[in-house]
């Protein structure tokens, strides 16, 4: 039971980061954006995190076109 609770808390933390990013960047709360930010929060996809960090550093935000390109490049094949 403890392991299940730990997994619940760990995954809820990822979910909170994902929703926090969507809120702070004023993005639409659609499944694609949630998936992008959830994977970002886990740190399991280093290339995705790198391109997001670079784009945010360069532009200060992610456009819908950026999000679509990120999804198509780094997540649509999963």
Regions found by a protein language model. Name each.
Residues 1-78:
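Extended alpha-helical signaling linkers and dimerization cores
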């Amino acid at each position: 039971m403890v392991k299940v609770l730990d997994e619940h808390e760990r995954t809820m933390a990822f979910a909170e980061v994902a929703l926090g990013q969507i809120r702070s960047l004023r993005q639409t709360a659609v499944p694609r954006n949630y998936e992008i930010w959830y994977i970002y929060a886990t740190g399991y996809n280093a290339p995705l995190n790198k391109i997001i960090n670079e784009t945010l550093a360069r532009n200060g935000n992610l456009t819908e076109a950026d999000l679509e390109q990120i999804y198509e490049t780094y997540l649509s094949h999963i």
